[in-house]
């Protein structure tokens, strides 16, 4: 009797399990042909009014552009100073653009950016800026370059410039499905070569990083005194693999100990894995980008070669350790670095890799949010003795990864555009819990906790550690777009910031196909 009961139970569970996996051929997919654009804008500085300034700042932009239709695109972008004496100037913005064919490979391209950020407050004030561009683009085989007439305007500040800028653009393909297909499992035993998903998988990795910079040489603080303190920074890195050994990456860091909050960096680059086994990867990387804030005024352009080892905890998780050398190209700041992090690997968007064809898959829910963030009565401190409060407005970019139907993890960057605090920025990581859906499945609540590093522009976070608990609601306009509203508290445990916070924005929702190991 017991044997029959056990056998029956096993058969029922096996049946339920098999029913939970659907055939991959029924999953409808979509493909977006996105673009990654890198541009350079020479910005005329107000050196007549401020003789201490160099006459020109070189501003580089990194843009991720998504087609809305065959002539209209939108996206998000970072700008950062690389030449001149404004190292540490960073901005985050949103953009809308037009791209129309004129003749054969020649295209008209125009766009408009709005964002927030900055560096030295007396030159940019609130931090809000606009950057319209208009010009020509030459395309061939999905790659392109172009020239534009550009206007850079920090609206309440002193930096206002017209110039000729240049850009290059490379393709980036995103294959995905609808957000309501998230958290489902699929099997592909005999998938047709003509199937939408019969493509190579894209390997990627995401990493939370902790780095420690030991300054050497002539490194100086912004007051001219020698910089000898070890700088502790927290950061995030994204890696996209070109093949099993070579990858591209982007990463950013913000300081939380060693100096008053305000130092940050942003790098892009490439890496190579000369040795890998079941348990470890040995890698080398070269990053080039920008860094600055709370150090002596420099151009910003910085290189960061490094090498390290990944210790694999599973097929998807690894502990990563690294060491490197950090050097300003147009300045004196340099440091030896050591660091560690937790790395998550994924295989997305297809069914085959260099090693094998995969058969078991799941769909991963992702939400990308653009927000307006309001912070009220934020404590500020301007040395030596001036203390006061102000209301801040930030533009925020946030990515949420659903672990299941109820839990998610998130990462966020935010930059000030109003409140006399241009140059304030934060980077946060954390997670949250969803409520059940209600009101015809259109509304879902959430509770969230985020923590990280933030500072600059006199915002009194001390060395930079901040936390932000919030409660909020999502309302689905469509399956792909939601309105987000939330409120909570913004608190610095070692500084004097303790403020109410309200966030309103849009969420763009999708699901990606991932290999289930």
Regions found by a protein language model. Name each.
Residues 1-25:
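Bacterial Sec-dependent N-terminal signal peptides
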Residues 34-38, 72-76, 108-112, 145-147, ...:
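Transmembrane beta-strands of outer-membrane beta-barrel proteins
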Residues 40, 160-192, 209-215, 335-357, ...:
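Outer-membrane beta-barrel "beta-signal"
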Residues 40-46, 78-84, 98, 114-120, ...:
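Transmembrane beta-strands of outer-membrane beta-barrel pores
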Residues 42-61, 76-77, 213-237, 376-396:
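Surface-exposed strand-loop-strand hairpins of Gram-negative outer-membrane beta-barrel proteins
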Residues 54-60, 86-92, 126-132, 160-164, ...:
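Residues that define the transmembrane beta-barrel architecture of outer-membrane proteins
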Residues 62-66, 94-100, 134-138, 166-170, ...:
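Residues on the lipid-exposed face of transmembrane beta-strands in outer-membrane beta-barrel proteins
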Residues 70-76, 104-108, 138-147, 174-179, ...:
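Repeated loop/turn-to-beta-strand initiation elements of outer-membrane beta-barrel proteins
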């Amino acid at each position: 009797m017991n044997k029959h009961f056990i056998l029956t139970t096993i058969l029922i569970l096996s049946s339920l399990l098999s029913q939970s996996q659907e055939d991959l051929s029924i999953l409808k997919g979509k493909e977006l042909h996105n673009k990654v654009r890198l541009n350079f804008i020479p910005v005329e500085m107000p050196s007549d009014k401020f003789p201490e300034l160099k006459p020109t700042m070189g501003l580089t932009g990194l843009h991720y552009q998504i087609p809305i239709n065959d002539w209209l695109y939108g996206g998000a972008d970072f700008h950062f100073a690389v030449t001149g004496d404004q190292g540490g100037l960073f901005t985050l913005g949103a953009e809308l653009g037009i791209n129309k064919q004129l003749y054969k490979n020649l295209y008209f391209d125009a766009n408009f950016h709005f964002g927030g950020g900055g560096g030295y407050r007396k030159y940019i004030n609130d931090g809000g800026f606009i950057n319209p561009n208009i010009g020509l683009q030459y395309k061939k085989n999905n790659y392109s370059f172009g020239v534009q007439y550009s206007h850079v305007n920090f609206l309440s500040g002193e930096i206002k410039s017209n110039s000729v800028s240049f850009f290059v653009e490379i393709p980036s393909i995103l294959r995905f499905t609808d957000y309501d297909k998230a958290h489902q499992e699929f099997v592909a035993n005999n998938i047709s070569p003509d199937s939408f998903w019969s493509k190579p998988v894209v390997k990627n990795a995401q990493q939370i990083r902790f780095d420690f910079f030991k300054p050497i040489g002539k490194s100086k603080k912004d007051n001219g005194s020698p910089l000898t303190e070890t700088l502790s920074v927290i950061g995030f890195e994204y890696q996209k693999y070109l093949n099993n050994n070579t990858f591209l990456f982007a990463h950013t860091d913000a300081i939380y100990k060693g100096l008053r909050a305000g130092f940050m960096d942003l790098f892009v680059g490439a890496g190579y894995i000369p040795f890998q086994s079941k348990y470890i990867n040995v890698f080398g990387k070269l990053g080039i980008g920008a860094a600055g804030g709370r150090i002596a005024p420099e151009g910003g352009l910085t290189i960061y070669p490094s090498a390290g080892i990944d210790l694999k905890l599973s097929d998807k998780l690894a502990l990563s350790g690294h060491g490197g050398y950090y050097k300003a190209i147009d300045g004196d700041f340099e440091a030896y670095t050591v660091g560690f992090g937790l790395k998550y690997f994924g295989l997305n968007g297809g069914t085959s890799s260099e090693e094998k064809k995969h058969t078991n898959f799941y769909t991963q829910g992702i939400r990308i949010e653009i927000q307006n963030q309001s912070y009220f009565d934020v404590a500020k401190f301007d040395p030596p003795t001036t203390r006061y409060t102000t209301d801040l407005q930030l533009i925020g970019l946030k990515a949420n990864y659903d672990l299941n139907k109820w839990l998610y993890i998130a990462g966020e960057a935010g930059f000030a555009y109003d409140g006399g605090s241009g140059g304030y920025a934060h980077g946060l990581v954390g997670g949250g819990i969803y409520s059940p859906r209600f009101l015809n499945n259109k509304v879902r609540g959430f509770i969230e906790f985020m923590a990280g590093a933030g500072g600059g522009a006199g915002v009194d976070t001390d060395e930079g550690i901040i936390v932000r608990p919030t409660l909020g609601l999502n309302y689905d306009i469509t399956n792909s777009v939601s309105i987000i509203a939330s409120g909570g508290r913004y608190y610095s445990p070692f500084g004097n910031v303790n403020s109410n916070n309200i966030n309103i924005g849009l969420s763009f929702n999708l699901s990606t196909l991932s290999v289930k190991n």
